[in-house]
Amino acid sequence: MLIYLTDYLSQYISGFSVFHYITMRTIMSVLTALLISFVIGPRVIRWLIRLKVGQSIRLDGPETHLIKTGTPTMGGVMILFSVSSAILLWGNLTNHYLLIATLTMLGFGVIGFVDDYKKVVYKDPNGMRSRTKFFWQSVVGLVAAFTLYSLAKVPAETQLLIPYMKDTFIYLGAWTVVLAYFVIVGTSNAVNLTDGLDGLAIMPTVMVAGALGVFAYMTGHLYFSDYLQIPYIPGVGELAIFCAALVGAGLGFLWFNAHPAQVFMGDVGSLAIGAALGVVAVAVRQELVLFIMGGIFVAETLSVILQVGSYKLRNGKRIFLMAPLHHHFEQKGWHESQVIVRFWIITILLVLIGLASLKIR
């Protein structure tokens, strides 16, 4: 929104022209989202406490988590508000990539909100029925995937790029919609599964979002995309502002979610930010790089799939002490803080490996 005001003011005061550049608006976006999170955080927490929106802890989970019963949940609303506010202020609202990413994030946020509401009001740790949740995730995911496909303007938007290999891609055509759907919905659920310890999901999300912001800027820049020999997609650079807002809001939320957490993001947060990562990765054609950088999310998801599969196919035998994976390490004796920080360290390494694909090819 402010881009229009600064464009007008730049006619009279040349200094305002700096806000036309994506780099400057990206910086302002991360700072704005961070500041808003700091300001509204304590108020949101007090509001959630007054509403008695406390977390219900699964009885089959680690016993050490029972102490967290009653901690305010649904704190993801502050993430969504901070991100949306920063985008409204610094984003180009005519850019369809930015609009699709924002609306997809909010759509999954609504699904998560309903899920959290059922958990809180009915004191049911399982919340919304799995089939119902998956149905609505599929609806929002397919709408986002099909919209991106229908608005594609360059061949790269219907290709699967192979990282670390020069000019190597797989033409997908209409199958792009299918891939996009699985990436968006899959990432949303993967982040949701990871959100089981204080700060465990939000910090990897911040790291991956920051890296995807770099990919978005480079892919949307004619000179840099040519220099790095990656596809040029006009307009997709605006997603750097979206990613920056997610980074700022995520760091602001971490301030209150760090161990011992004052608030949990709930499904309203985890489903939304996961979908946000997925839709950005699809838009900038870095689905495989997301798979690498989000390795923690992938490992958490696979641990659940393998655990359930093993239990059903091997007469109740389990692979892990408990799933998702972070609970397995807790059961092995790792302190919660050790699990969190070690998973962060792994994510840092994976993000650096992902970013290296910009030059290694």
From Swiss-Prot:
GO terms for cellular component: plasma membrane. It is found in: Cell inner membrane. One of its GO terms (molecular function) is metal ion binding. The chain crosses the membrane at residues 21-41, 73-93, 94-114, 134-154, 168-188, 199-219, 236-256, 263-283, 288-308, 338-358. Its main location: membrane. Keywords: Cell cycle, Cell division, Cell inner membrane, Cell membrane, Cell shape, Cell wall biogenesis/degradation, Magnesium, Membrane, Metal-binding, Peptidoglycan synthesis, Transferase, Transmembrane, Transmembrane helix. HAMAP family: MraY. This is Phospho-N-acetylmuramoyl-pentapeptide-transferase. The lineage of its organism: Bacteria, Pseudomonadati, Pseudomonadota, Gammaproteobacteria, Thiotrichales.
